[in-house]
Amino acid sequence: MFEVVIGLEVHTQLNTKTKIFCSCATSFGEAPNTNVCPTCLALPGALPVLNEEAVKKAIAFGKAVNATINKKSVFNRKNYFYPDLPKAYQISQFDIPIVEKGELFINVKGENKRIGITRAHLEEDAGKNIHENNFSKVDLNRAGTPLLEIVSEPELRSSDEAVAYLKKLHSIIRFLDISDANMQEGSFRCDANVSIRPKGDTKLYTRVEIKNLNSFRFIQKAIEYEVKRQSEAWEDGTYEQEVVQETRLFDTTNLVTRSMRGKEEAAEYRYFPDPDLLPVLLKDEFLDIKIPELPDEKKARFIDELGIKESDAEVLISSLEMSRFFESLISQNLNSKLCVNWLNTELMGLLKGELTIENSPVDAQKLGVLIKRIEDGTISAKAAKDVLAFVFENTSVEIDEAIEKLGLKQVSDDSAIEAVIEQILNANADKVAEYKSGKDKLFGFFVGQTMKEGKGAFNPAKVNEILKTKLG
């Protein structure tokens, strides 16, 4: 039996307005090579100037994961050649990163586990190579975008743990609002270092790096395939030949990893301090940066203060947008449990395909009005589902307008309900007698008959109240 050893390196693009060492915009999707200047193009004489906002965002992350924030950190040149790296070196941090010795906690199959974070350092992103037909093109818009590289300890023992760690990290980054962490656009990318060893062995064996994984599903599949490949090689006696220190890519079509190149050692990059950048010396006020409420804190507050079930609270903190939507709902002085049900179950049940809570056709204000109409008895919960479906498809229609159009307004007028109840009781005198002699279950019969006669428009609470008075 083997034990799996996984360490993850995550590159997240920080959401600063400008690049890390120049004033070019960081906006995604612009025409190729338009967000560039002499600094990102590495023209002679162009000098880097550090973006203060990138430093603040790195510090915020460090505080969120209980890390040590170094008052002094140093930028280094990482030397290698690639077409999308115009300087032929990347400005990064090596021996003195801005953040080190952090931690976060994951929960897998009901068990909590601490995962150490070795370091988080600032660096610049490279450009992008685009291969079309027989040509390769280079877009340098991304070159110089600020990255925070977050390196975990090799303490993850399964693909499930790796995905749980990444989801937790992704959530923290989003709640801090230091990155949009959009995996599809490449602003949250993961490299997985995977090795195996016999159970009980503490030695670290040959690790393989799988590069640029950009979805939780692919990360899981890539790790599972690589573990299977290495395990089979060990059992077949071909481990030393088949498993070498290398970088592999994940084939998302066939769900296999393929060899890309040999894995470089740190010495091969010839790191040395960048002579164009002074060491970063942090003043005390930088270390006092306030960070927002994090997912675990928010979850605890929802449970303790609002009486929400843990499973529901998990859904509410599943994304920054979801928690913002919920907090916007409860800020309207609504019943928190009703809000949870109508958000987690009813609205989320309608959001399919490209629709997410972020671009939901029904916003928090509109859903809040619907919940108010349930609370004040204007409509029943059953009718409210029809109203929600209607305004979901007809976005320009307001809740009250939809209630009128659909004719779903409840009758709460005592005299109208009383008149119908009188008719039903008179027509069922025998059942009234049975009820009064102790057959309490007949109460449901009278409620059902009244609601049927009122064609579902009667306020159920009013019906119950009047029936109890009439039946004594």
Swiss-Prot record:
GO biological process terms on file: glutaminyl-tRNAGln biosynthesis via transamidation; translation
GO molecular function: asparaginyl-tRNA synthase (glutamine-hydrolyzing) activity; ATP binding; glutaminyl-tRNA synthase (glutamine-hydrolyzing) activity
Pfam family membership, one: GatB_Yqey
Keywords, alphabetical: ATP-binding, Ligase, Nucleotide-binding, Protein biosynthesis
EC number(s) from the headed UniProt entry: 6.3.5.-
Catalytic reaction(s) noted: L-glutamyl-tRNA(Gln) + L-glutamine + ATP + H2O = L-glutaminyl-tRNA(Gln) + L-glutamate + ADP + phosphate + H(+); L-aspartyl-tRNA(Asn) + L-glutamine + ATP + H2O = L-asparaginyl-tRNA(Asn) + L-glutamate + ADP + phosphate + 2 H(+)
Function, in words: Allows the formation of correctly charged Asn-tRNA(Asn) or Gln-tRNA(Gln) through the transamidation of misacylated Asp-tRNA(Asn) or Glu-tRNA(Gln) in organisms which lack either or both of asparaginyl-tRNA or glutaminyl-tRNA synthetases. The reaction takes place in the presence of glutamine and ATP through an activated phospho-Asp-tRNA(Asn) or phospho-Glu-tRNA(Gln).
Subunit and interaction comment: Heterotrimer of A, B and C subunits.
Name of the protein in its database record: Aspartyl/glutamyl-tRNA(Asn/Gln) amidotransferase subunit B
The organism of origin for this protein: Campylobacter jejuni subsp. jejuni serotype O:6 (strain 81116 / NCTC 11828)
Name of the encoding gene: gatB
